[in-house]
């Protein structure tokens, strides 16, 4: 990011005198997730708690939005020697929208010397031992821990019978859920039709 910012502001263009190569790699959150199971199977987002370059109100807004949206969260830079209250405040924001029992994984130095993995829950997050080398994975409403593995279901159980594999009542294989976009719109239209005056304002 900073490399491109400096180059572009200095008048550099792709194909110019300075060659830039971006080599893809494994992100910290992916490495950490692989050590605890499959917590990122469904939608997720990453948020840094460092306010060295980002105002805290922006960080807080992102935390609240992610929690309301039921995203699995990966928190970077959760705590440092000087930033001791940021994780406490983040926990407070998240608990407005998540149960205290929500599974949490804390991974330190994934695949490096000093690696450590700790499973806990959101209600105990602020008391956990962690620092700048730690990444925090916070589950969504469906995430669970079983036999030491943190798993976020992809959602197949909502659509298919776990034993037979057949679509559940009202669902069709290869089609959107009954409450996918089209189904949801149809349900809203039906509700509006039943309301007096049939207007959205009545909703």
Regions found by a protein language model. Give the residues of each.
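Mobile late-domain/C-terminal helix-loop "cap" segments
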Residues: 192
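Class I SAM-dependent methyltransferase SAM-binding "motif I" and its flanking Rossmann-like core
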Residues: 1-69
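Short acidic, hydrophobic short linear motifs in intrinsically disordered regions
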Residues: 197-203
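Charged, amphipathic alpha-helical regulatory modules used
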Residues: 187-188
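A contiguous loop/helix-start segment that scaffolds small-molecule binding in enzyme catalytic cores
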Residues: 6, 68-183
């Amino acid at each position: 990011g900073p490399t491109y910012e400096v180059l572009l502001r200095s008048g550099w263009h792709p194909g110019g005198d300075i060659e830039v190569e971006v080599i893809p790699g494994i992100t910290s959150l992916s490495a950490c997730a692989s050590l605890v199971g499959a917590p990122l199977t469904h939608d997720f987002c990453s948020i840094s708690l460092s306010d060295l370059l980002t105002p805290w109100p922006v960080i807080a807004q992102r935390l609240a939005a992610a929690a309301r949206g039921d995203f699995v969260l990966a928190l970077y830079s959760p705590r440092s020697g000087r930033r001791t209250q940021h994780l406490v405040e983040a926990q407070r924001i998240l608990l407005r929208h998540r149960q205290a029992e929500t599974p949490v994984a804390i991974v330190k130095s994934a695949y490096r010397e000093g690696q450590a993995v700790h499973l806990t829950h959101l209600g105990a997050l602020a008391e956990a031992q962690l620092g700048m080398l730690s990444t925090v994975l916070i589950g969504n409403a469906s995430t669970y821990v079983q036999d030491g593995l943190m798993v976020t279901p992809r959602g197949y159980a909502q659509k298919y019978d776990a034993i037979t594999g057949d679509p559940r009542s009202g669902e069709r294989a290869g089609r959107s859920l009954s409450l996918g976009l089209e189904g949801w719109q149809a349900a809203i239209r039906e509700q509006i039709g039943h309301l007096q005056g049939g207007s959205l304002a009545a909703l």
